[in-house]
């Protein structure tokens, strides 16, 4: 998977906008950031809950690392070249779900929940 493929999927999620965030690019819904892209374009940071984070770390330790803000784990750093596209899409959808309005989430269930 590459950043352009991840970007296309993120932008397909209802209400998503891409905007700068310091030196990063960010994907937001309702003004809330659910994923960022570091300047290198080789990684994707997704802000998922602890359950999703630990599940992804167990399934794909070569592609996922804990993402920290200070001492707190806040999501995942995904090495895009090592990640399966279906997994990246699932994680992006999970991160979007945490920030999107409930009506949007109900109207757009994750088609890859088991990926």
Where are these regions (language model features)?
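Charge-dense, helix-prone N-terminal extensions
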Residues: 1-115
């Amino acid at each position: 998977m590459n950043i352009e493929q991840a970007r296309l999927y993120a932008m397909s999620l209802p209400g998503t906008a891409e905007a700068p965030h310091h030196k990063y690019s960010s994907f937001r819904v309702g003004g809330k950031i659910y994923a960022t892209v570091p300047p290198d374009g080789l990684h994707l940071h997704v802000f998922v809950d602890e359950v999703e984070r630990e599940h992804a770390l167990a399934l794909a330790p070569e592609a996922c690392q804990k993402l920290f803000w200070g001492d707190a784990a806040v999501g995942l750093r995904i090495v895009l070249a090592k990640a399966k596209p279906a997994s990246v899409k699932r994680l992006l959808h999970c991160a979007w779900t945490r920030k999107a309005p409930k009506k949007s989430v109900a109207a757009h269930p994750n088609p890859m929940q088991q990926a």
